[in-house]
Amino acid sequence: MAHKKAGGSSRNGRDSAGRRLGVKKFGGETVIPGNIILRQRGTKWWPGDNVGMGKDHTLFATVEGNVSFKKGFKGRTFVSVLPVAEAAE
């Protein structure tokens, strides 16, 4: 008798949603304290002046100012926030 074995189900067909990583505020943009500057896995970018780093390596502003990206020590890119000058009284 000619029988055909039952076909197995495919093991493909799944994918995970994108994690929405990357730069959220680019160089020169104005930020306020708490604004997320970028999301990353690991330390592709390092926190510079007036920037904090969360436990998931997210960089965020700690003061109001403009975002700045600079190359530094060991080829690392540092993200800083340059405070806006206070209005003269």
UniProtKB/Swiss-Prot annotation:
It holds the Pfam family Ribosomal_L27. GO terms for cellular component: cytosolic large ribosomal subunit. Keywords: Ribonucleoprotein, Ribosomal protein. It comes from Dinoroseobacter shibae (strain DSM 16493 / NCIMB 14021 / DFL 12). Residues 1-22 are annotated as: Disordered. The lineage of its organism: Bacteria, Pseudomonadati, Pseudomonadota, Alphaproteobacteria, Rhodobacterales. This is Large ribosomal subunit protein bL27. The keyword Ribosomal protein applies. One of its GO terms (molecular function) is structural constituent of ribosome. InterPro entries: Ribosomal_bL27, Ribosomal_bL27_CS. Belongs to the bacterial ribosomal protein bL27 family. The keyword Ribosomal protein applies. It comes from the Bacteria. GO terms for biological process: translation.
